[in-house]
Amino acid sequence: MTAFADLMAHQRETQALSQVMGRLGWDQETMMPRGAAAQRAEEMAALEGVLHSRRTDPKVAEWLESIDAAGLDEVGRAQIRHIRRAYERASKVPAALAARIARVTSEAQGTWAEARAEDDFAAFAPTLTEVLALKREEGQALAASGNVYDAMLQDYEPGTTGAELEAMFGALRPELSKLRAAVREAKAPPQLTGTFDEGAQMKLTRQLARTFGYDMSHGRVDKAVHPFSSGSGLDVRVTTRTNPTDPFNCFYSTIHEVGHGAYEQNISRDYLLTPLGQGASMGVHESQSRIYENQIGRSRAFTGFLFAQMKEAFGDFGVADAETFYKIVNRVSDGFIRTEADELQYNLHVLMRFDLERALISHDLQVADLEAAWNDRFEADFGYAVDKASNGVLQDVHWSVGLIGYFPTYTLGNVYAGCLNEAMRAGLPELDADLAQGNTAAATGWLQQSVQQHGGLFEPREVIEKASGMPPNEAPLIRYLSQKFGDLYGL
């Protein structure tokens, strides 16, 4: 075998083990008995040790050194780019530190869940302090003399810096605040009332997953506390949650996660269990979930279809017509929870977390002061006070499991989705007629061809520019939100 073939065989086994780690994580969130947490933490730490050893195996460096990348085709060069980046990053982090992070974050997830249930941030603060210290140590190893937060960002959005995000978000925040203020002055649409059987919600939500092209022969939809997607290639799983008085939470969580899942399912099978067999970045991943959920799923055309589906599932639920239903689905409402926020306000939740986590990593904010800082920023941005920790600083799992640098990719995904949506609609003039019939094939097909099939072949910015014909920027998102909510609220 050639050095390249040897390297790719090694990568395939490593990717397979990584998928096993993902299945353990999925099980931890969905099926695992509560009493198994300590053992699962040990299992995941052991597997992380094996993965770290493989990722830092000196043979990888030898293979990389002996391969002439110039002699490879585009796909081969991209594989080498990913492998080299991952090897260099993994080699900078001591194995003992990687294993400790895996163990501590696995245990921290349980501590966070208990503290959240008790609305007690003080009970979680020591654990969060330990997680942040470990992640900061990892970031310092990765950054060398560079910016620690920037080094952390590379795990989720290669090529992006905190300063670039700060500039983009700085342009976005005042526009969102201005539009939000105008909407709050306008007459609000009615709210959904009544109760909706949770079993019927799950039945309809699985139908919606299929409507959006999710392949249930290679996936499944289950319930979890925090909706997420897991896996790649031939095994891609999504979760959702139900609320008897808010079926939209279930349906749109599912559509969102199906956007992630469809991305993974639609990557070229040629890339299966290789570095290219995954999304280009978390921001690009989020662009798919957001465009499925919002630009497609919350469009006037598609909500007309969903209205009919809900009437079939639940009977008369007190909404007179499809136009009223559309307004209810897109109602701008006060609320504390990021994952339940409407399109207009969602990014304000993310920008707050971006600023707070940067301050935590730079030591400008201490964990002891985090809850107060959160509450102050929330009241400044939203105009009302956080009522309890589970609705505030404890609502998200991310920091407990060490996902520092992840939050900004949510808004970056919305920015990317804005660019993609403009290009998609320009190329599909009959799209709304299709969506009104529940036919998403043209939209999902366009995204599959333009974005999803390529997996990690291109760098994130390159993916968006090739697909949309423009460099990533916030202007299309601002145009989309201004037009949509201006129309909805008569601004």
Residue ranges and their predicted role:
Residues D246-A262:
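Short alpha-helix carrying the canonical HExxH Zn2+-binding catalytic motif
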Residues F169, R173-L176, E198-M202, L208-D222, ...:
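All-alpha helical catalytic cores of prenyl diphosphate-utilizing isoprenoid enzymes
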Residues M1-P158, S482-L491:
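A well-structured
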Residues L7, A143, H256, S289, ...:
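Divalent metal-coordination and catalytic microenvironments
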Residues I101-N249:
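Contiguous, non-catalytic segments that form substrate-binding/exosite surfaces or channel walls
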